[in-house]
Structure formats: structure tokens, C-alpha cells
């Protein structure tokens, strides 16, 4: 397995761990309602698998990466979108879908155009990170599992967000992931 791929996985994993620390800090700072927690353990499991299955596939099946620069660039763009989303939400962002009681609709950054730019970024990462190393099967399996978990999570999260004053007016006509399409 290429060392650069292990380094890429390590960097992406370290970033996820750092985001968990930020999320915990944000959760301690706010009072709010939490989306149903049933999806969170599944989400954690799928994310752990994102960092374990691809290297096993690459090593076990002796996969070779095709166009790694393209996939790493796509991963970089998705990561930039995710970080922009997190920064735009500020202290409201967390991984457990806790909706602060004083939340107002956030319409800055990528939220000007879509409701869930962070989840869009994660969807792209679930494709790009495995494929960058040549793990096509992992990308397909993990993307499917991630989609199932995200659909449940988004449904629960939007149920809480609809109770936020001004949310329906701000986001009712915005697409979830792709402006004007979906």
C-alpha cells in the first residue's frame, strides 16, 4: 500500500478527531434539543469504517489507485466545503445534531445556497477518500451505508430545525445538497 495513502488516511482521521473535540466543546456551551440519537452510533460506525475498510481493500486486494490527484483534489474541495460549513455555523455546529434553543437560521457561507453543505461534503469524502487509494468496493459500500444513515439523520435534524423561528422561511425553498436540483 502506498505510504502517501496511509498518510492521507491519517491526516483525514486526525482532522475528524479534532472536529469531535470542537463538537464536544460546542455541545457543552449550548442548551438545546437533540435529534434522535439512534443515527449517531451508526454514523460513528460508518465513519470508523471509512478509515479501516479502504486500507484493508487496498492491501488485501492489491489495489492500485487511478487518477489519485483527481480524487485527492476532490477530497480537498469537499474538506474545504465541510470546514466552511462548520465555520459558518460557529458554536451551533456539532456532530450530535443538538439544535441550540437560541438558534437563528444561518444564511451565510454555503448555507446561502443549500440546507446541508456539511453533509454534501461528507458524501463526497466517502467517495473520494477510498477511491483515491483505489478502494472502489469500499467507496460503493460505505457510500451506500452513509446514505442510509444520513437520510435518517437529516430527517430527524430537519424535524427539530423546522421548530426554529424563521427556518421555514429561510430554507423552505432551498435544496438540501445541490442548488436548484436536490
Predicted segments, located by residue:
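Feature marks short, highly hydrophobic, charge-poor N-terminal signal-anchor/signal peptide-like helices
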Residues: 1-4
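Cytosolic-biased juxtamembrane loops and peripheral soluble domains of multi-pass membrane proteins
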Residues: 21-38, 63-182
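Physicochemical signature of membrane-embedded alpha-helices that form the seven-helix bundle of GPCRs
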Residues: 8-11, 46, 74, 141
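N-terminal signal-anchor/start-transfer transmembrane helix
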Residues: 9-23
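Long, highly hydrophobic alpha-helical transmembrane signal-anchor segments
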Residues: 37-67
Amino acid at each position: 500500500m502506498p505510504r502517501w495513502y496511509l498518510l492521507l488516511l491519517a491526516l483525514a482521521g486526525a482532522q475528524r478527531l479534532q472536529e469531535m473535540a470542537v463538537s464536544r466543546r460546542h455541545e457543552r456551551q449550548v442548551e438545546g434539543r437533540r435529534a434522535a440519537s439512534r443515527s449517531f452510533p451508526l454514523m460513528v460506525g460508518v465513519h470508523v469504517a471509512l478509515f479501516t475498510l479502504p486500507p484493508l481493500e487496498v492491501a488485501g486486494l492489491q489495489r492500485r489507485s487511478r487518477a489519485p490527484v483527481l480524487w485527492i483534489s476532490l477530497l480537498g474541495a469537499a474538506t474545504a466545503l465541510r470546514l466552511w460549513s462548520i465555520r459558518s455555523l460557529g458554536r451551533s455546529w456539532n456532530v450530535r445534531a443538538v439544535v441550540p434553543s437560541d438558534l437563528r437560521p444561518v444564511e451565510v457561507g454555503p448555507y446561502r445556497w443549500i440546507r446541508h453543505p456539511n453533509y454534501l461534503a461528507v458524501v463526497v469524502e466517502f467517495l473520494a477518500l477510498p477511491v483515491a487509494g483505489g478502494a472502489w468496493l469500499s467507496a460503493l459500500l460505505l457510500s451506500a451505508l452513509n446514505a442510509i444513515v444520513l437520510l435518517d439523520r437529516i430527517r430527524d435534524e430537519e424535524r427539530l430545525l423546522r421548530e426554529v423561528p424563521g427556518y421555514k422561511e429561510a430554507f423552505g425553498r432551498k435544496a438540501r445538497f445541490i442548488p436548484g436540483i436536490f
